[in-house]
Amino acid sequence: MRIKVSGNIISKTDQSKTNYNHGIYSMFIANLDEPLSSNIHNQNSKEYRLFTFSNVYIKDDKFHLYISGADYIILNFINNIEKNNIVRIEDMVLVIKKIVPCKELIKKDRYLLKGRIIATEVIDGKKKLLIENKDINEKLKKVSEGKLKVLNINGNIEFDVLKKTLKTSRYKAGIHIKSYDVLLLVSGDYEAIKYIYDVGIGENTSTGQGLMWEV
């Protein structure tokens, strides 16, 4: 399930700040029930956190962002926001006025998607981005299969990286994340594709990676 969250900015103390990925993660986790929030936050493998999100888009005193994930997680978040719609994302205090479900993918044979993904290998004990498209395709498939298993969804999914550009973004103080802006051709079984599209493609989606949009 993918939702658009929008509303008003009550206060913002750092006018130069534009990247809120770490703050969005903290806000999202804080608005989930226990033990769901603890279970997600304490997972050893960040590869299988079944949600992702966009940055916050700001215009004047308005904001919006997108959050996408497994239905039970998103519905839990919505339920808690209905109880208290004032949230904090780092230096901002926001009042959420509207939550609107986004349209699901229409069933077809293949999809052209764009967005930012992480696909890594471990070298000398450190995670490094994969370089070759073939290796990235295989890793995206492997991670997707792991997520589908957790979701009890059967089905095949295949990836083909058509274009990629290396990006480095600030996550929080002292931590920068390397990823690829990609154009992906995705094919396979509709149910598998639909669920992976919702929960995020690739690794480390809880940092705001893996939110893809159909071209």
Question: What is each residue range found by the language model?
Answer:
Residues 1-215:
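RNA-interacting cores
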